[in-house]
Amino acid sequence: MASYYWQGQQTASGARFNPNAMTAAHRTLPFGTKVRVTNKRNGRSVIVTINDRGPFIRGRVIDLSSGAAGVIDMKGAGVAPVSLEVVGG
């Protein structure tokens, strides 16, 4: 399950948070890892770069920036079932 977020000044990697960038938070993947996130409800995908830590809510595997959430059309629901594929690091 993925969620999205839009608040914050600085990410755990030290980068300034940009809600429109194609970025995400993951608990264990190294910063800079590129991940294809696919919304299982509609098949839409986005490639994001991991630059933060989280999510810290049980059952969620990734937190997307607002911009990335918009690409896979999950902002209305707030959360969506997703699949993750590491595509680069």
What is the meaning of each model-derived region?
Residues M1-G89:
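Secreted/periplasmic proteins
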